[in-house]
Amino acid sequence: MDFAQQHHQATPVLLANVWDVPSARAAAAAGYSALGTSSAAIADTFGYNDGEELSFAELLLLVTRIREQVALPLSVDMEFGYGASVAEVVDNLRALAQTGVAGVNLEDSLVADGERRLVDAETYARRLRAVKTGLEQAGVALFLNIRTDPFLLNRRQALAETVARGQLYARNGADGLFVPCVTEAADIAAIAAAVALPLNVMAMPALPDIDQLTRLGVKRISMGNALHSALQEHLHSLLQNVRQQQSFKGVFSHAGD
């Protein structure tokens, strides 16, 4: 079953979001069927803020190493595409495809002056259609999972805006719809019913469990930066314990597990 087909199963595809080779290897060892990169986790690993402060060259190098070491299908978080022009975005996606990447996330918001803003829906749809056409002309097949951010930005009419954008993107080349920060069951069900694309939601404290998400019509579940953040918190705790307790016992508490 290829990556696109994983989005049309009875149960959602569960993506492990990774940020380096060790995290990708860990996900493979844990039995995951697909991986996705987390832009926030990768940016933090390189010492940047999220929002394309990381260069595409740095991202491509990391993705290449992951692909060389782990055979699972990989979707890359490309944020706004790392290019102002459609031609730049298409060139970047072609470079990713050459590494064997199966898909990408592209989002309809931009970070400028430290603030994230939605791009006009029609403007973004034209950009998406042009990117899709450019890839088709280049003979590049990638699963385009389009992230729309009304819920992430806590917009007043988040549900209606998400549905409208999702339907528009479905007509302009999207293969999937990613709606981060949606957590209410009624909202999830409404989006899944109204938009003819596999629906991707993201792990959140209030997100329903996977069985309920399956019944609501979700087809893809990703983890965002949650794993990376949890590991960083654990690392900070270990470091503090060593200094405060003047002992390394806590560091080796899982040795042999």
Residue ranges and their predicted role:
Residues 133, 224-257:
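Extended, intrinsically disordered, low-complexity segments
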Residues 1-76, 82-223, 230-232, 236:
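Alpha/beta enzyme core
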